[in-house]
Structure formats: C-alpha cells, structure tokens
Amino acid sequence: MRISVRQLTEADWRIFSEIRLKALLSDPAAFGSNYALESKFSEAEWRRRLRGDDSAVFMIFDDETPIGITGVAVDRDDPAKKTAFLWGSWLEPEFRRRGLSNLLYKTRIDWAKNHPGIERIVVSHRASNAASKHANQKHGFVFTRTHEKTWTDGATEDEVCYELKLKS
C-alpha cells in the first residue's frame, strides 16, 4: 500500500465526479448534498468546482487507485474572506479506521494556513456522525454551536459546528 494525496485540477473532472457520486451514493447521510442533485451536473460544472484559487479538492490514492476525497474552500459567507471551511470528506469503507483521515485533515489545514488571510477553519457534521466528531476534536477543532437542520435527504437533525483558529 502506497498512500498519496494530490490536489485535483480541471483535467481531473471525470475522476472527481466518479468518486464524489460514489461517496454520495454509499454514505448519503454524511453530506450536505445528494446524488440526485449532483448526478445531473454537466462536465462544465464538475470542471468549475475544481477551478479557482479560493478552493481545493484533494483525492487520496492507494498507489494509483482513488480511495477517497475531501475539500476545503474560502467561506463565501465571510465578507472578510478570513474563514475556510472543510467539506465533502469520504474514504472507501475498507480504508477507514487506518488513520488516513489524519492525512486529509493535515492536507486541508495546511492549505488554509498557506492561503493568504485565512484566520480560522470551520467544519460541521450531523450530530449522529460520531466519527466526524472524534476526528474534528482530534485535530484541534473546538465546538461552537449546534442548530437544527433539514438535510438534503429530508432528515431533520442537529448540525454540530466547530472552528479551529489559525491566528490569534
């Protein structure tokens, strides 16, 4: 097993779409989006999601085989552009519980630290997602709040929010 992570580019749109859709199908409760919506995306939309300086999508590989995906972006809701948010993490089930999420967290946190102006990172998950809770806390994220949310699968459940301050 040779594990590597790399940032995707527009040229990677096809593998991005395949792994993202696979993730949405296999673990729909883990995401703020859904397969029905994203399966209708055009090539142009997949490419757009991989373009730009204010976001990054990373794929984790076992040798040359993609086994997971994750993303980070500057938060559009922060007019000062000082906040990044983590989104869309997923690993193939047989690669879970091997510490690989540590590599995904480190990659995204490093991206945010190296992105000019970012002072904090936010992340959230469903209250029932114990694995995300553990991973967020393990990487220094501090609980900030919960609020009720209706998720894209129609379920209503609390969203648990955290932040990691990068600069004081």
Predicted regions, residues:
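Terminal substrate-recognition subdomain of acyl/acetyltransferases
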Residues: 2, 8, 138, 152-168
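Conserved SAM-binding loop
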Residues: 5, 125
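Residue-level detector of beta-propeller blades
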Residues: 7, 66, 143-145
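Acetyl-CoA-dependent GNAT
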Residues: 10, 18, 23-94, 105-107, ...
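Amphipathic alpha-helical recognition patches that constitute DNA-binding helices
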Residues: 15, 85-86, 120, 131
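Conserved active-site alpha-helix within GNAT-family acetyltransferase domains
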Residues: 98, 102, 127-145
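Conserved GNAT acetyl-CoA-binding A-motif
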Residues: 112-124
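Conserved catalytic-core motifs of GNAT/GCN5-like acyltransferases
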Residues: 122-124, 142-159
